[in-house]
Each structure stands twice: as structure tokens, then as C-alpha cells.
Amino acid sequence: RSIHADGDGLPGLVVARDGDYLSAQFLIPAMEQRRDLLVPLLVEQFACKGIMNRSDAGVRAFEGLPQEKGLLWGSVPDPVVIREGQLEFAVSLEHGQKTGSFLDQRENHVVAGRYARGLALDCFSYIGGFALQMARRAERVTAVDSSEPACEQIRANAARNGIANVDVLATNVFDFLRAEVDAGRRYDTVVLDPPAFAKSKDAIAAGLRGYKEINLRAM
């Protein structure tokens, strides 16, 4: 994450860097209006080969802005190959979640791999960042995500790295955890990396219930 909105004094602008390529989100009118000014500055600052516009976040609707995504500058291959620790991951900067990959979790992925053992479970796995790192030490890993395209990416990334001890399931994580608990199945290592369950004040109560449920069932 090269630019993190308010945290870097640039509210409404998020820029992630994957190797030679950038993904950018312009989330408020002030940044949207300055997009044509910002793009050449990003090119100059990061010496990148291409910039993908990922301004398709739902928060833009609250600002009266349409959702947009597509190439902003240069060229961006699909997928882009990134490296985390000793593993390679293919990610789509255009079609992946948010800016394509969750770079803020990169170090956590590697650390989880060091502590994994026995039978491991990765819930909300996305492209397998936690699952594939854990597979290097765990006996076997189950990766669960509700998105079939994401699960296809996990399988492809496992094959890319020669990893064969990962089972990938495209199913609802809540339903999966309930079924595992009911069946009495247990895991030695469990990772929960859920999306935001509460994106507005009205959703806070339901979001807290969701977080409580997955944590209780994981334990």
C-alpha cells in the first residue's frame, strides 16, 4: 500500500503497488476531480509501467460518484505475478477484490506459515495468501471462500508453487463452520480473515454477531 488515504494526508486516494504496476482508487469528488492531475504524478513518482483504476468501491455511491474500473495509463497484464516470501501469486488488478491483492496482509501471510501445523483451515481465503503459506508446514490445509473465481485462483496459485496439500472449497464460510462443528471435526491451526461485516452504522449489530459467530465456531 503506497498511499493510504487519510493516513497519508490524502483522503479519498488509495494506491497499491504490485511490482511495476499500480492500482488506484479515487473515492471522493475532490480526488476524482484531480484524477488527470494525479495520474502523471503517480507515474513519475513510482516509475510504473501501468495504472489500473479500481474506483468501483461502494463508498463512491455515498459521494454521488459512479463505480468505475479499467486501465488508466500504460499497460497492465492480467494477471500480475507478485511474490510473498518464497511463494508467487497471480492476481488480477482489474477483477480482483479492492485493488487486486491485500498487500497489508503480506507479512501476516508469511508469519502464519511459520506457525502452522497439523490440519490447518483458512476461512475467507481469497487467493490463498494464508492457505498456501501454511501449506509449507502444515500436514494439510483446507481453504474456504464463497467465490468460485477466487477458489480457482487458489488452485492456480497452488499449482504455480508446486503445492499439492491444499483442499479448496467454494462455499459459505458460516455454513461450513457450522457443519464442521456439528460433525466434530477439529483443526490444529485456524485463520479467520473475514471481510467487513459492518460497512455502516446500521449494520454494526449484525456485524458484531457475525464476528462473534465465526470466532466461537473456529475455537
Label each PLM-derived region with a short phrase.
Residues 74-219:
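Rossmann-like S-adenosyl-L-methionine
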Residues 21-26:
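Carbohydrate-binding surface patches
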Residues 1-3, 219:
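Short intrinsically disordered, low-complexity coil segments enriched in acidic
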